[in-house]
Structures are given as C-alpha cells and as structure tokens.
C-alpha cells in the first residue's frame, strides 16, 4: 500500500508539471497572434487593394507607414462635380479628388479621412492655421503659390475659359472689352484673363504689372466682380450682375446649361496639385504616391471614372 501511495504521488506531480508547461506555451502563442493582428490590420487592407500599389513608396524601410492611425484632414470643394461634390441629401463627398484623398489616407496609414469644405479664398488660410493637413480642391500650382505651400506633381491639367449667356452675343476675348466678369475670390482667373486679353491685343498692357496686379482695382479694358464661390457667380450671370463667368473649363462645365456657351478661346493651362504646409514631412510622402499613381495609370483611371478627360 505504501508503494502504491508513493507511485500515485509521483504520477500526480508529473501531471502538474506537464499541465504547467502546456499552459505557459499556450499563453505565449496567443500573445504573438494578438500582436500580429494589431500590427498588420491596415497592411491587410492595403494588400487587398493590390500588392503592386505604389502605397509601398510611402512606407519606411522597416515596413512602418507614415501615420500610425489617426485622421487625415483634407480640404476639398463641395460644389465642383467630378472633383469635389457634397451630396445635399446624404452629406457624402464624391469626385476624383475625394477618391485621391481616400487613397492617400489608406496608403499613408491613417484610419480615417475628415473632409472640410474650402473655397479659393479659404483653402490656404486653413492650411496655414493647421486646421487641415492637405488640400485637394482644384488648387492651381503657380510659382507664387509655391513660395507659400508645397505642391505635389500635378494630377490634372485644365485651361481657363469664359462662360456667357447666349443672349449676350459675346463669342470671343475681343467681345469682353469693357465688360464685367465674375470670378472667385482668391482665384487666378482674373489675372489669366487680363493676360490673355493683352496677348490677343484686345486691351493695352502698358499699365499691367504681374506682381502688382489686384483684381479689385483693375479697370483697364475689363472689370471684375468677386464672389465667394462658383454657384454665386452662376447666379450673378443669370441675373445680369456680370457679363461673363471666368474659371477653369472643367468647373464651368457644371454651369453650362441650355442658353449658355463658352467663348472661342481657352488660355492659361491650370495644373492641379495636392497642397501641403511648406516643409511638412507629409509633402514628400504625398509626392511619392501621386507620381506613382501617375506612372501606373491609376490617375488616368480616375479621370475616366469621373468623365474628366
């Protein structure tokens, strides 16, 4: 009996040690599995979009992305169909620039995107104030603007033209002489129109100084009325407050309804880029992504999707 009790005790102790060893191994494996899921959740999402996506260009050599979660704050237009448009019923944004913003957020490692409606007059101010991280809002790249903000390689190129009512009998730059033209505050349209009219010999260029040009004081051969945004200019054109509406053609297309037409000329190519704060670390990462998407045809696909070709 004594021998049996000793054998039973030995077997019991062996069982305890065996169970302890198994329990320790199981806990370590679970910890590894949890950590792997947390580290690779966003990577799996990116992989689902295509292993050849240039999002990898925004990753560091150790596989880490620019952002570790958080929200990418993007300034966009809300009334430019095809680029940035906010559905009045759902509040949802859509358009080529909205798609690019979502792609940037995913490739850079953000969890979410927050859209803020901007105008030509407010987009730079909001960027400077740190209220948004970048701007995708038909923002034309100019040498002057590049002194204030970083811009990516252009993802879209447009040209400026002029929209008028059929009843106006305006068909060319020459017909705009001594007329009043509606433009958006903070845009480059007025300056481009003056230069085009000077180049065409419609108005003299003696008093024109590109660096000193001011929309509200220019009256030499053509005058301008500034408005907060494009729908306001379209309304003013219909009401006869202005004789013409001048901006990029892709934007004017939204307002070219029956009874309206473009003048014969287009001028001043407009290159749209992603704008970021001057010297911001995100600037270089966005540049890599945009150039990658231009090279692999992704941007062309978006232009086709939104009928902007």
What are the functions of these language-model segments?
Residues 103-107, 114-117, 121-135, 148-150, ...:
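Short helices/loops that flank or line small-molecule/ion binding pockets
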Residues 113-175, 260-266, 279:
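Acidic, polar ligand-binding/catalytic clefts
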Residues 74, 78-82, 93-106, 158-220, ...:
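Bilobed "Venus flytrap"/periplasmic-binding protein-like clamshell domains
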Residues 52, 60-138, 285-286, 296, ...:
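Extracytoplasmic small-molecule ligand-binding "clamshell" domains
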Residues 5, 20-51:
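Bacterial lipoprotein signal-peptidase II cleavage site
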Residues 138-148, 192-195, 231-268:
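A ligand-binding cleft/hinge motif common to bilobed small-molecule-binding domains
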Residues 58-64, 68, 111-114, 188-224, ...:
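Ligand-binding clefts/hinges and TM-proximal coupling segments of bilobed small-molecule sensing domains
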Residues 78, 156-164, 249-291, 308-309:
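Periplasmic-binding protein-like
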